[in-house]
Amino acid sequence: MTLKSSEGEGGNSMRTALSDLYLEHLLQKRNRPETSLNQSNVTTEDMYTNGSPAPGSPAHAKGQEARRVRLIQFEKITEEPMGITLKLNEKQSCTVARILHGGMIHRQGSLHVGDEILEINGTNVTNHSVDQLQKAMKETKGMISLKVIANQQSRLPALQMFMRAQFDYDPQKDNLIPCKEAGLKFVTGDIIQIINKDDSNWWQGRVEGSSKESAGLIPSPELQEWRVASVAHSAPSEAPSCSPFGKKKKCKDKYLAKHSSIFDQLDVVSYEEVVRLPAFKRKTLVLIGASGVGRSHIKNGLLSHNPEKFAYPAPYTTRPPKKSEEDGKEYHFISTEEMTKNISANEFLEFGSYQGNMFGTKFETVHQIHKQDKIAILDIEPQTLKTVRTAELSPFIVFIAPTDQGTQTEALQQLQKDSEAIRSQYAHYFDLSLVNNSVDETLKKLQEAFDQACSSPQWVPVSWVY
């Protein structure tokens, strides 16, 4: 049930443990009874055109084709939308294009995608536009009668798939959506249950935990990635920036070069498939934030208040040790040649240089903390998030934002600007965001949130399990 991992035995063992946990969770859910759809106030009656016989009759058995027409009647007594969209097929017949999960029609189970509608309340739909028919369906109240030819190929099982949104979406601001009222609004980090993805451009989903039971339309990953790439293509070119927090320069040539898969993964985000696991312990606490936001104070506070729970992996450096420094305590001192060799062997999760000396944190140092049954604290650059967000490290990622109180000095404004640049580019990785108005207050909220995460069911990337 597990896939190969390039992180070594530690990564494989952690992935296996999470896979076993997920399998146990699925087995516990297997015997739960399913709820049936509400079909009250709906009547159906089979009819046959041109005197064609019913299926099973001798004439039908000889291969004569029968166009089976169903008369569907139901009462619409509220302003609730019917949750249905129509289209004209290649024969210019009116067919059901989409049924929103949880909507009125879906709950009744009276229509299915692909069904052909012949009449609405006795009126033949021929020579009517889709907009006219949609309006008629929307404005009709009381008893509604439909004559329908069923599409027998549309009876597909319900989809069970969950995705974490990696962008904010408001259907009212989307000019591409076929029906704004049918759209689903969500924000980065929302868990969306995917109900239907038959349409390559518009999936149906609902936000997990929302009071709204009916599904809404959301852009498919392909459509969203095309949209972002199109915006990048049309954006004016910018001068390259060396700042890690500067606005990322979109390279249209790279994207046009046959949609490089690596470029897509790095620059275009839409959704991430996730699974829900029972409570398990996160092994790493990652602090993300702009320089000067107070991550070091928070890290030191956690280490001093809970030395038995948290530990910080001592970085490796090529600079000479000071007289008061002990090798392996605050730093591991190493030669430039050896560090370069270790970097080539992918032993560092993060490395860089400062004032001519190299610094870096090794995976091995983090693993040693885990073996002591402690939680490793990492205060890394946001570019490293892709590297650490694995089942092997099982991180809980916290974004520290600058204070929103006090005098707006020039330094604070710059800090807020840098923080917003990080948030806008990496927010889809964050498990928690905290405003650091007070170190003590931030420490309290962080520890409470971390403990809550480790003791509650959690949504994790599907790659952590399979």
Curated annotation (Swiss-Prot):
The keyword Glycoprotein does not apply. Residues 268-466 are annotated as: Interaction with PALS1. Residues 29-65 are annotated as: Disordered. Residues 71-152 form the PDZ domain. The modification Phosphothreonine is found at T49. One of its GO terms (cellular component) is membrane. Keywords: Acetylation, Cell membrane, Cell projection, Lipoprotein, Membrane, Palmitate, Phosphoprotein, SH3 domain. Palmitoylated. Signal peptide: none annotated. Disruption phenotype: Neutrophils form multiple transient pseudopods upon chemotactic stimulation, and do not migrate efficiently in vitro. It is found in: Cell membrane; Cell projection, Stereocilium. Essential regulator of neutrophil polarity. Regulates neutrophil polarization by regulating AKT1 phosphorylation through a mechanism that is independent of PIK3CG activity. Heterodimer with PALS1. Interacts with DLG5 and NF2. Interacts (via guanylate kinase-like domain) with WHRN (via third PDZ domain). This is 55 kDa erythrocyte membrane protein. The lineage of its organism: Eukaryota, Metazoa, Chordata, Craniata, Vertebrata.
